């Protein structure tokens, strides 16, 4: 296990500055990770303000406690070790029914990718795992070895958008008939063997999309994000804001759709007024996603696929 939890925060200032932080407000970092967003947000709060920081990874919380120690001493932080799909439930337990802002940094964090034994990366040999919550029973091993051909094709297409999903699923099926597929390196080699030679010459690792698909399936990432963002929109006070960083098209599409549904209203034309229960809850702060600056892209390779979407609560 690595001793340090290194993580270069993506879109740090944009994500928090767009929240328009109120010094005495109540805020949530739904994806604590390396605590970069939390630390910057806390720097904008007075001792009367409060941050609730969620992460299902105990390691992330332990490291964040060191980084955020000055704010913890002032009683400004509450840590919640749980999947953010339980956002509303956990906040209710803490007596919180309204928040002034919330930020999300979706997907796997850099420390999780870099920690070899977590099995997230196709670049390092490790047991097939990919669990964000280490106490969960379901891992990448079960997906790769227990899912039938049709289920593998389904998740590879749906979550990896890989056009060679059928060929890869077939190769996996053949390989595990000989022996179980146990490591990330074994899986990466099987994926490579299923792709044509000209595909292997293209930029990017040939296993990237499939590893993404398995990771999303293991952690139900899109289902959790869908539930959590909808809960967050309901929890926001009027004028409260939500920031969501995404790293691939599936996350971005989901966020865009949820924001669109909450910021538009479907009423008959010519209606003299819109009833309160039909008024849009959100207003988009930016119609197009906010992208990292050229300077950030130069400093942080992970930022290249990042997109930030922000919205404001305008009606309960």
Swiss-Prot record:
List of residues binding S-adenosyl-L-methionine: 35-37, 55, 84, 105, 112
Protein name: Ribosomal RNA small subunit methyltransferase H
GO function terms (MF aspect): rRNA (cytosine-N4-)-methyltransferase activity
Primary localisation category: cytoplasm
Stated role: Specifically methylates the N4 position of cytidine in position 1402 (C1402) of 16S rRNA.
Pfam (any one): Methyltransf_5
Keyword rRNA-binding: no
Keywords linked to the UniProt accession: Cytoplasm, Methyltransferase, rRNA processing, S-adenosyl-L-methionine, Transferase
Subcellular location per the Swiss-Prot or TrEMBL entry: Cytoplasm
Family, similarity comment: Belongs to the methyltransferase superfamily. RsmH family.
Enzyme Commission no: 2.1.1.199
Catalytic activity: cytidine(1402) in 16S rRNA + S-adenosyl-L-methionine = N(4)-methylcytidine(1402) in 16S rRNA + S-adenosyl-L-homocysteine + H(+)
UniProt xrefs under NCBIfam families: 16S rRNA (cytosine(1402)-N(4))-methyltransferase RsmH
GO terms (BP aspect): rRNA base methylation
HAMAP family: 16SrRNA_methyltr_H
Gene: rsmH
Signal peptide per UniProt: none
GO cellular component: cytoplasm
């Amino acid at each position: 296990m690595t001793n340090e939890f290194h993580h270069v925060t993506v879109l740090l200032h944009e994500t928090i500055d767009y929240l328009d932080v109120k010094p005495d407000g109540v805020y949530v970092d739904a994806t604590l990770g390396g605590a970069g967003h939390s630390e910057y947000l806390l720097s904008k709060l007075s001792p009367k303000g409060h941050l609730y920081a969620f992460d299902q990874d105990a390691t992330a919380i332990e490291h964040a406690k060191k980084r955020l120690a000055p704010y913890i001493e002032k009683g400004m932080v509450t840590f919640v070790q749980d999947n953010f799909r339980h956002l509303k439930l956990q906040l209710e337990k803490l007596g919180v029914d309204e928040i002034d802002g919330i930020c999300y940094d979706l997907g796997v964090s850099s420390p999780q990718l870099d920690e070899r034994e977590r099995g997230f990366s196709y670049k390092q040999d490790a047991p097939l795992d990919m669990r964000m919550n280490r106490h969960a029973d379901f891992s990448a091993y079960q997906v790769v070895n227990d899912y039938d051909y049709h289920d593998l094709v389904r998740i590879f297409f749906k979550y990896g958008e890989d056009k060679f999903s059928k060929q890869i699923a077939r190769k996996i099926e053949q390989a595990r008939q000989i022996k179980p597929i146990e490591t990330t390196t074994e899986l990466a080699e099987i994926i490579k063997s299923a792709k044509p030679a000209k595909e292997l010459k293209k930029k990017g690792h040939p296993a990237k999309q499939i590893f993404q698909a398995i990771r999303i399936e293991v952690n139900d990432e899109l289902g959790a994000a869908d539930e959590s963002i909808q809960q967050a929109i309901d929890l926001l006070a009027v004028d409260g804001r939500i920031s969501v960083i995404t790293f691939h098209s599936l996350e971005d599409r989901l966020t865009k759709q949820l924001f669109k549904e909450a910021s538009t209203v479907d009423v008959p034309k010519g209606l003299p007024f819109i009833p309160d229960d039909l008024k849009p809850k959100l207003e988009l702060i930016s119609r197009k996603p906010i992208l990292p600056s050229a300077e950030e892209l130069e400093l942080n390779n992970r930022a290249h696929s990042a997109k930030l979407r922000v919205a404001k609560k305008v009606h309960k």
